[in-house]
Design a protein with these regions (language model features):
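Active-site cofactor/cluster-binding pocket
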Residues: 1-142
Length: 142
């Protein structure tokens, strides 16, 4: 959920129209949370139909496998980066930020707007660590 929130803010700061939706699959009992995020000039619905997703970012390999049906023909599945991510983050709680760093290299959003979005969400709470991990995900060690 935090990852979709940060991505949404980064897109807003870039000047895009943003719609976001979350589907909670018994998350309070350890189930998955599926977030859909769309941005562009004019976005009318937050839900993305099966076979139309441009980027799939999953934080568990099993979830990536289950959600693969959502990917479009030209879609990019970032699930394969999970192994690298787990080696690069100091704690699992930073995995989503690392994955956002990877995703950010594909999207038309300036790095400054990603950083601004991270600051918007985290304020002072682990802000330096989150920025560092985000930059590692981008392949830019700070």
């Amino acid at each position: 959920m935090t990852a979709a929130e940060i991505c949404g803010w980064a897109a807003i700061f870039e000047g895009f129209h943003v719609k976001k939706s979350e589907v909670h699959g018994m998350a309070q009992r350890g189930g998955s949370v599926e977030s859909h995020l769309r941005f562009g000039k004019n976005v009318f619905s937050p839900l993305i139909p099966d076979g139309k997703v441009d980027f799939l970012v999953a934080f568990y390999r099993e979830e990536g496998g289950r959600l693969k049906k959502l990917l479009g023909p030209e879609g990019v599945d970032l699930t394969g980066v999970l192994e690298e991510a787990q080696k690069c983050v100091p704690e699992r709680k930073y995995l989503n930020i690392f994955m956002l760093g990877k995703l950010s290299s594909f999207l038309p959003i300036k790095k400054e707007n990603w950083i601004k979005a991270i600051e918007q969400i985290f304020h002072n709470k682990n802000l330096a660590e989150n920025k560092t991990v985000f930059m590692k995900g981008r392949g830019e060690d700070r």
